[in-house]
Structures are given as structure tokens and as C-alpha cells.
């Protein structure tokens, strides 16, 4: 089954999807595989692999290979640029950073990466990527014109544009390790215009309560990344969040 169809089946069954993000630059491939396995044991539905800096080349390939040896759930690339692609993954979030000032993140990296995706037959999942204040490292690297936290209507029209351009997913990103996640008002406004299209929310989600607030507001999928790198018991932390968001 294709990865996008697989995630849709999970939403139909459980109501929501949990994704764990692993940055290859943050640890060795072996450690990344350990984290991925622990997250899967906690109930995560797929492993996202990537980051805004340093996730490319041999390190990326070795990380994907090691993770796939350990787990049975899909691996999805989350590339910071065209260099963040690996033929060993199951799928890629083929995304455009719609609120970037730099055309490289809007379309040029996508043009450069498309031939590799085509040749390797990685499944592309089209996605509008939107960075919200505070934005963190990804906002700086991506030269994003950050969407103000208190302006949900701006996020909504960006998301609507992405939907009309044919993108299946929209990702609201507060930035890795953000002090607080995207607020519920913005999540709700975006989900309202997306309808059946899927909404992912990430950044600043460290516990079950926060994850539940995001899904109750309209998020279809939750991403946790920094927290799994920081806690000692990854399985317990992921299980806590998963149990809060799924029915």
C-alpha cells in the first residue's frame, strides 16, 4: 500500500496520525534507529527523516537504511533542500515553503529534486509547508516571512492557495523546539478551508495535553521531534502523546 493511502487508513481507523521526526544530524545512524524503534513501540505511525541543516548524503542514506532495518512503519523524507533526498526511503513530503522569500525553497529545490524522486520511485506526497512564528532554525534557513501567531486568516489563505495548487497536505510549523506550538485558532481556521485535505502540525509539541489541544482544534497529524531526542524513555513519551490524540 502507498504511504499516503496507509496514513489515510489510519485516520479512518484511529482518527489521527502521530509522526516522529528524526534529524540525521543529531545522532549516529545506529542511535537514530534505536529512537525510531522506541517510537514505533510507543505507537507512532511513521518516521519522518530530515532537518533544516546537515541531513544529506551518506549520513542521510545510512540513517534511513538503519531505521528501515529496525521498524515496520513507513519512512518519510522531510528534506530541507534537494540534498535531503535518499533513494532508500519509502516516501517524501514533496513540499513547497510557500511563505519563503527565497525561490529556492518555493520551487528551485523541487525542480532539482524531482528527477531523483522519479528515478528512485520514492512516493511523493505533495505538501504546502507554512512556517509560523517563532519559526526557529527552519524559519531562518528557509528565509520565511513568518506568519504572525495572532493572524490565523493569513495562514488560512496560504493553505487555501496550496490546496488549489493541488497539494494534498498542509504543514503548519512553529519551528523545532519552539516554546509553544501553533495556536488552536490558527489550526482551526486552516482546517476549515482545507476540508478533506490533511493538516499536519509540528513544533513545540512536548506532551499529551498540547498534542490533544492541536488535534481537537483540527490537526489530522501531529509531529514530535525534539522531545524524542531529549527524553530518556522515548517509548513512554510517544505512547503518552499517541493515547491522547487517538480515539
From Swiss-Prot:
**Keyword match Methyltransferase:** no
Q: Which UniProt keywords apply?
A: Cytoplasm, Lipid biosynthesis, Lipid metabolism, Magnesium, Metal-binding, Phospholipid biosynthesis, Phospholipid metabolism, Transferase
Q: What general EC class does the enzyme of this chain belong to? A: transferase
- Its domain of life? Archaea
The listed locations are: Cytoplasm
Q: Which GO terms describe its cellular component?
A: cytoplasm
Q: Where is the signal peptide?
A: none
InterPro entries for this protein = GGGP/HepGP_synthase_sf (IPR038597), GGGP_HepGP_synthase (IPR008205), GGGP_synth (IPR010946), IGPS_HisA/HisF (IPR050064)
Molecular function GO terms recorded: imidazoleglycerol-phosphate synthase activity; magnesium ion binding; phosphoglycerol geranylgeranyltransferase activity
Pathway(s) per entry = Membrane lipid metabolism; glycerophospholipid metabolism
Annotated binding of sn-glycerol 1-phosphate, by residue: 171-177, 203-204, 225-226
Under catalytic activity, the entry for this protein gives: sn-glycerol 1-phosphate + (2E,6E,10E)-geranylgeranyl diphosphate = sn-3-O-(geranylgeranyl)glycerol 1-phosphate + diphosphate
User: Where do the annotations place Mg(2+) binding?
Assistant: 23, 52
Q: Write down the Pfam families for this protein, in alphabetical order.
A: PcrB (PF01884)
Give the similarity note. Answer: Belongs to the GGGP/HepGP synthase family. Group II subfamily.
Protein name (Swiss-Prot/TrEMBL): Geranylgeranylglyceryl phosphate synthase
Question: What is the originating organism of this protein?
Answer: Methanosarcina mazei (strain ATCC BAA-159 / DSM 3647 / Goe1 / Go1 / JCM 11833 / OCM 88)
Amino acid at each position: 500500500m502507498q504511504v499516503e493511502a496507509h496514513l489515510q487508513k489510519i485516520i479512518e481507523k484511529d482518527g489521527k496520525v502521530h509522526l516522529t521526526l528524526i534529524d540525521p544530524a543529531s545522532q549516529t545512524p545506529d542511535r537514530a534507529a534505536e529512537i525510531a524503534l522506541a517510537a514505533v513501540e510507543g505507537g507512532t505511525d511513521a518516521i519522518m527523516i530530515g532537518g533544516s541543516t546537515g541531513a544529506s548524503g551518506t549520513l542521510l542514506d545510512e540513517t534511513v537504511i538503519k531505521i528501515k532495518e529496525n521498524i515496520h512503519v513507513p519512512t518519510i523524507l522531510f528534506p530541507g533542500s534537494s540534498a535531503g533526498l535518499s533513494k532508500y526511503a519509502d516516501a517524501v513530503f514533496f513540499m513547497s515553503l510557500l511563505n519563503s522569500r527565497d525561490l529556492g525553497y518555493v520551487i528551485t529545490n523541487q525542480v532539482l529534486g524531482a528527477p531523483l524522486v522519479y528515478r528512485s520511485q520514492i512516493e511523493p506526497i505533495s505538501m504546502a509547508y507554512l512556517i509560523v512564528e517563532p519559526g526557529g532554525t527552519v524559519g531562518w534557513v528557509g528565509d520565511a516571512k513568518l506568519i504572525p501567531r495572532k493572524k490565523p486568516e493569513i495562514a488560512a489563505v496560504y493553505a487555501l492557495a496550496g490546496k488549489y495548487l493541488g497539494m494534498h497536505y498542509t504543514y503548519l510549523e512553529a519551528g523545532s523546539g519552539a516554546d509553544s506550538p501553533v495556536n488552536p485558532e490558527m489550526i482551526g481556521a486552516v482546517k476549515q478551508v482545507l476540508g478533506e485535505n490533511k493538516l499536519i502540525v509540528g513544533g513545540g509539541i512536548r506532551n499529551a495535553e498540547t498534542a490533544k489541544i492541536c488535534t481537537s482544534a483540527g490537526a489530522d497529524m501531529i509531529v514530535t521531534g525534539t522531545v524524542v531526542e531529549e527524553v530518556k524513555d522515548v517509548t513512554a513519551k510517544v505512547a503518552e502523546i499517541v493515547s491522547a490524540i487517538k480515539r
